């Protein structure tokens, strides 16, 4: 394989390090921040050189789709299979706001975090602190499996009677539904009707 420049080596080694730690590659922005490059076009240029020299492979149709090419000169790398999951608007964990019902981006997740059919999975960004006692914090990404039913105690994404989306713990009571926040300073939401969008099956948090 052709020799790398100092900057190309820095980028290549950073990509390998992130893959080894997280199981998936960094974004262009993260690469730039790590090696001190403010211009994303400059980072793209270095990635193109790495690809031309046979160190990486990329899929231009997907974000973060950088694959380390192994050969005799490279360390063995265990890169976990990733899937690209749609990120759909934002869901309020607090005062509900109307969810944006379109795909904002696709986010790569290690396959083990989904544990179900990939086509049924989507991600929502959490806004607010009503679920903090369940370990769901403002800015987290909740991994959601699409489904329209729920059992008491499930953490769900629901549409309220005002067509607003929210993350809460679900309870069906005698004549109503209770959407219970996991924050002792907040009151539950009581509804005559509630539409379950999906069940929260996982959580992703960037450290």
From Swiss-Prot:
Site for Cleavage, residues: 93-94
Name of one Pfam family that matches: LexA_DNA_bind
GO terms classed as biological process: DNA repair; DNA replication; negative regulation of DNA-templated transcription; proteolysis; SOS response
CDD domains tied to this protein: HTH_ARSR, S24_LexA-like
A GO molecular function held by the record: DNA binding
Catalytic activity: Hydrolysis of Ala-|-Gly bond in repressor LexA
Alphabetical list of Gene3D superfamilies matching this protein: Umud Fragment, subunit A, Winged helix-like DNA-binding domain superfamily/Winged helix DNA-binding domain
Keyword DNA repair: yes
Domain of life: Bacteria
Position of the signal peptide: none
Keywords: Autocatalytic cleavage, DNA damage, DNA repair, DNA replication, DNA-binding, Hydrolase, Repressor, SOS response, Transcription, Transcription regulation
Keyword Secreted: no
Record EC number: 3.4.21.88
Family label: Belongs to the peptidase S24 family.
PANTHER family: LEXA REPRESSOR (PTHR33516), LEXA REPRESSOR-RELATED (PTHR33516:SF2)
Record text on subunit structure and interactions: Homodimer.
Name this polypeptide is given: LexA repressor
């Amino acid at each position: 394989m052709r020799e790398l420049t100092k900057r190309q080596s820095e980028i290549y080694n950073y990509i390998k390090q992130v893959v080894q730690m997280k199981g998936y590659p960094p974004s262009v922005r993260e690469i730039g921040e790590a090696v001190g490059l403010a211009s994303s076009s400059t980072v793209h240029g270095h990635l193109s050189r790495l690809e031309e020299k046979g160190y990486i492979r990329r899929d231009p149709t997907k974000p973060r789709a950088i694959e380390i090419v192994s050969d005799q000169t490279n360390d063995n790398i265990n890169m976990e299979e990733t899937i690209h999951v749609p990120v759909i608007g934002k869901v309020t964990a607090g005062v509900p706001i109307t969810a944006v019902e379109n795909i904002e981006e696709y986010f790569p997740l290690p396959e083990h975090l989904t544990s179900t059919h990939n086509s049924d999975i989507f991600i929502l960004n959490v806004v607010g602190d009503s679920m903090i006692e369940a370990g769901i914090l403002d800015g987290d990404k909740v991994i959601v499996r699409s489904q329209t039913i729920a059992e008491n105690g499930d953490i769900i994404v629901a549409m309220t009677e005002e067509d607003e989306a929210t993350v809460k713990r679900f309870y069906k009571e005698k004549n109503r539904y209770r959407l219970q926040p996991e924050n002792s300073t907040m009151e539950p939401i009581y509804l005559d009707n509630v539409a379950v969008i999906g069940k929260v099956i996982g959580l992703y948090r960037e450290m």
